[in-house]
UniProtKB/Swiss-Prot annotation:
Protein name: Endoglucanase 4
Gene: GLU14
Compartments where located: Secreted
Active site positions, chain numbering: D77, H418, D469, E478
A single cellular component GO annotation: extracellular region
GO process terms (BP): cell wall organization; cellulose catabolic process
Stored Pfam families: Glyco_hydro_9 (PF00759)
Chief localization: secreted
């Protein structure tokens, strides 16, 4: 983010409201990033900060003769699902790309040093979170020619047990997509993740960045050449958990990231988007952004970075209008307490992704001195920022329940998270194995979590702002990496803006 653009965006924050920040966004950002260390699979590094975790899944991939150790567990179980993991890496990368300058790596002289955080290594830790996922995706994409490994473990077998990752003895089956069993959706998202991550490391580690970009281009070519959905090829193990509604959006999403990541080939990917956009559904309005649907994000991403895409801007504006209460085109649902509500299972994933898009679009509008036309109403960047702030603040505690939905943040937060590792004694404190069936007593226990899953954002309350803090209540009490990933960017924005305008 350029200095001039940053000042324009932060000026919009001031217009949105001059009151002091209600929350310590920098602390929330630290915790949101820390959560990813609790989700790590594989050989943990010396600098691992979540001390109650230990090595796990070290032989992952051996069932197919490849090394698939590493990566992230997506939520509260011990499965490594490729589609949500790749989306997580894409969104973590986008958070760093868009708002990394607002994450202090060390005391900065930028704008007079006002980003100083006492040496808080937020940017370094965010990059580490990106790299942990990107390393795994790189292995999954390059281990075998014309093959992308997309999942480790049968979720049905995994869910028959309640085990710590360090103890798991359920089959670590390996699943892949190939020319004969295609998966353009998961391959497209993997290409997007690798391309986005390559931008993150372009300056700090050029050789690694180049390796990621090369792999991204290969995986995209594979996804485009062998078209088909992994929900068809691997339906028995990816559905109903992470069924993909279509692979069309992932192909355009991946091409968009490759357009940004490949300066020497940007015209090639832009031409692909122009030639394939109609067939891949780019001319349809859409109102949701998630691990399964990237259409609105792709349009917003592209129209702010490429010329000649006026239709994409119109669709993005329609999406924005759908979110703004009172605007022409408004069609979203909010709880009585003001939380965006899409659906009952893990609703917070839509809240965080929406808040992120609102802020990135506000940044674009500010830099262009533009607004969104919702009928006769001109919606300003400050309105988008204010709306995003309300969503973030709701998560952190400004809600009817007066509780934070981020574990470890504030005085009141969920204490019974649907998460195996958090609910059971740490392997550090209880080295003896806890078996498959034995673990269920921790799932059903009324006792609070044994280990603090700091930074985890749970699924959240229902349409009436009600929340049941129960470990059995996976729809409301389970966290996920793809909920936290876009929140990292949103929190970085508000942490940085707060530092600028607080005396």
């Amino acid at each position: 983010m350029s200095r001039a653009c940053l000042l324009l965006v932060v000026a919009a924050v001031c217009l949105a409201g001059r009151e002091a920040a209600a929350f310590n966004y920098a602390d929330a950002l630290d915790k949101a990033i820390l959560f990813f260390e609790a989700q790590r699979s594989g050989k943990l590094p010396p600098g691992q900060r979540v001390a109650w975790r230990a090595d796990s899944g070290l032989s992952d991939g051996s069932a197919d003769g490849v090394d698939l150790a590493g990566g992230y567990y997506d939520a509260g179980d011990n499965v490594k699902f490729g589609l949500p993991m790749a989306f997580t890496v894409t969104m973590l990368s986008w958070s760093v790309i868009e708002f990394g300058d607002m994450m202090p790596a060390r005391r900065s002289s930028f704008l007079g040093g006002i980003f100083g955080g006492g040496g808080v290594a937020q940017l370094d830790n965010a990059r580490a979170a990106v790299r942990w996922g990107a390393d795994y995706l790189l292995k999954a994409a390059t281990a075998t020619p014309d093959t992308l490994y997309v999942q480790v473990a049968d979720p049905y077998q995994d869910h028959r047990c309640w085990e710590r990752p360090e103890d798991m003895d359920t089959p670590r089956s390996v699943y892949k997509v190939t020319p004969q069993s295609p998966g353009s959706d998961v391959a497209g998202e993997t290409a997007a993740a690798l391309a986005a991550a390559s931008i993150v490391f372009r300056v700090s580690d050029p050789s690694y960045s180049a390796k990621l970009l090369d792999a991204a281009q290969l995986v995209f070519d594979f996804a485009d050449k062998y078209r088909g959905s992994y929900s068809d090829s691997l339906s028995s193990v990816v559905c109903p958990f992470y069924c993909s509604h279509s692979y069309h959006d992932e192909l355009l999403w991946a091409a968009s990231w490759l357009h940004l990541a490949s300066p020497e080939k940007k015209d090639v990917y832009l031409s692909y988007i122009g030639s394939n956009g109609h067939a891949l559904g780019a001319e349809q309005d859409d109102f949701t952004f998630s691990w399964d649907d990237k259409r609105v994000a792709t349009k917003g991403f592209l129209q702010s970075r490429a010329d000649g895409l006026q239709l994409y801007k119109a669709h993005t504006d329609n999406y924005i209008c759908s979110l703004v209460p009172g605007a022409n085109g408004f069609q979203s649902q909010y709880t009585p307490g003001g939380l965006l509500f899409k659906e009952g299972d893990s609703n917070m994933q839509y809240v965080t992704s929406t808040a992120f898009l609102l802020l990135t679009y506000a940044k674009y509008l500010s830099s262009s001195a533009a607004t969104v036309s919702c009928g006769s109403t001109a919606v300003s960047p400050s309105t988008l920022i204010s709306l995003a702030k309300k969503q973030v603040d709701y998560i952190l505690g400004a809600n009817p329940a007066g509780m934070s939905y981020m574990v470890g943040f504030g005085a009141r937060y969920p204490r019974h998270v649907h998460h195996r590792g958090a609910s059971m004694p740490s392997v550090r404190d209880h080295p003896a194995r806890i078996g498959c069936d034995e673990g269920f007593r921790y799932l059903h226990s009324p006792e609070p979590d044994r280990n603090l899953l700091a930074g985890a954002v749970v699924g959240g309350p229902d349409a009436g702002d009600a929340f049941a803090d129960g470990r059995d209540n996976y729809a409301q009490a389970e966290p996920s990496t793809y909920t936290n990933a876009p929140l990292v960017g949103a929190l970085a924005f508000f942490a940085g803006a707060h530092k600028i305008f607080t005396p």
